[in-house]
């Protein structure tokens, strides 16, 4: 079993000037292969689980103070169809070619929540995999226009990267490299916001 791989960080920041009220910031984190052994779920299986290497104290705190789903199911057994459902709010078979693993094409007639948030004044951005393998030009979250990969994209291959680097410099240094990459990507997103967002 591979380590949990966070493949999505969809970042959204609110603009309070559009509606006159203080709208919340939204950070949507979506992961492939999260599994029952990862982070907050680890307590269910015990501290000696196979993913004990991955320490996610902030995610765990949010999960413990909010809702933690321990019996949830995806609408499809593959990443792209599942993600097309999450992005659109539709069953994957109602998203047409957007549910195809390789060569997915988004139908612009199907609304997606990231672009709807952007229309209402939110600053949106993403880092790492969001919908389908590769970087499709018509992605339903702004595609290249909203990408924040300035720090790199090695986090997409968390377990492969740490496994390759760990023998020379240790697991902690390998993990820190990846965390720094994530911080740089997020800082670039924050730096791009317009005033009031």
For each predicted feature, which ranges?
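Formylglycine-dependent sulfatase
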Residues: 2, 11, 18-197
């Amino acid at each position: 079993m591979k380590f949990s791989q966070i493949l999505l960080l969809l970042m959204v920041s609110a603009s309070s000037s559009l509606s006159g009220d203080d709208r919340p910031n939204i950070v949507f984190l979506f992961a492939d292969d999260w599994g029952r052994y990862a982070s907050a779920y680890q307590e269910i299986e015990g501290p000696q689980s196979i993913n004990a290497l991955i320490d996610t104290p902030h995610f765990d705190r949010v999960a413990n103070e909010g809702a933690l789903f321990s019996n949830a199911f995806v609408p499809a057994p593959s990443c792209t169809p599942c993600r097309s459902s999450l992005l659109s709010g539709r069953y994957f078979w109602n998203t047409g070619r957007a549910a195809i693993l390789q060569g997915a094409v988004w139908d612009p007639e199907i609304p997606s929540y990231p672009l709807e948030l952007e229309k209402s004044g939110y600053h949106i951005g993403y880092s790492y995999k969001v919908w389908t393998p590769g970087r499709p030009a018509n992605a339903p979250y702004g595609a290249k226009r909203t990408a924040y990969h300035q720090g790199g994209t090695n986090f997409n291959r968390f377990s492969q990267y740490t496994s390759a680097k760990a023998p020379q410099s240790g697991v902690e240094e390998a993990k820190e490299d990846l965390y720094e990459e994530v911080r740089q990507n997020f800082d670039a997103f924050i730096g791009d916001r317009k005033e009031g967002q």
